[in-house]
Amino acid sequence: MKTRVITAVVALIVFLPLLFLGGDYFKFTTYALGVMAMYEIVRMTFKETNIVILTLSSIVGALLFLHKDISSLLQYALVYLILIAMLATIVCTGHKIKIVEIGVIIFVTVYIFVGFYCLFMLRNFSLSHVAYLLLTIWFTDSFAYFGGMKFGKNKLSPKISPNKSIEGSVIGSLSSIVIAVLFFNTTSIFSNLLIAIIVTLIVSVIGQFGDLIESAYKREYQVKDSSNLLPGHGGIFDRFDSVILSAPCLIILLNIF
């Protein structure tokens, strides 16, 4: 518990000032988080740190974060060449790297970096947008955990995450309505309360799907945590699994409503 608390305090001391500063500071922060998450995923997938794959994946992420500074044609060409280079590693390693592994890495590269880029874009909207997203996820996770402990009887996904219950999931999502009401009354994110509640419930549910997706990935590769980069908390992918999926979802919903 002591290690967990110390890690959380240090992480907040580093993360919060960069979040408040926003701009290029937070852009670099979210990109760095994406690279660290990909480091964890590469290690899970290949059982070692494949520097070539990690580097190529990180370059794809950089192109996404710098897309406004690079011409579209050049960007598409570079991404295409990088994907070809990833596929070429199958031949260069004598088929030690499998096609399915490269396919997974290509998909997850997009999944991770789009998620973190959307988190950066939310900060560009306002600090309130990021605070809203993080608090929605935190409320959902916390109340789903305690609600499941108290009332959980039916497994949500027994083969992927046997400790999660349907009751806990529902309680977690319903608890997020508190965040909807709070941010409707204190910010200009939402035009009316009903929209705030609808968006928040959807974000809450999508965040839980993000958690299950990460759990499925870890179960596939038989690991408990994505890494030990955050002692007591696991890895970056462990901490941001819900955010990665819910950030793009929130941007889409805000454009719809």
Segments from the language model and where they lie:
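Membrane-embedded alpha-helical bundles of polytopic integral membrane proteins
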Residues: 1-165, 169-201
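Hydrophobic residues in alpha-helical membrane-spanning segments
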Residues: 18, 232, 247-249
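Juxtamembrane boundary at the C-terminal end of a transmembrane helix
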Residues: 252-257
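Hydrophobic cores of alpha-helical transmembrane segments in multi-pass inner/ER membrane proteins
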Residues: 82, 116, 244, 248-250
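Acidic (Asp/Glu-rich) catalytic motifs at the cytosolic membrane interface
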Residues: 35-45, 137-153, 166, 205-245
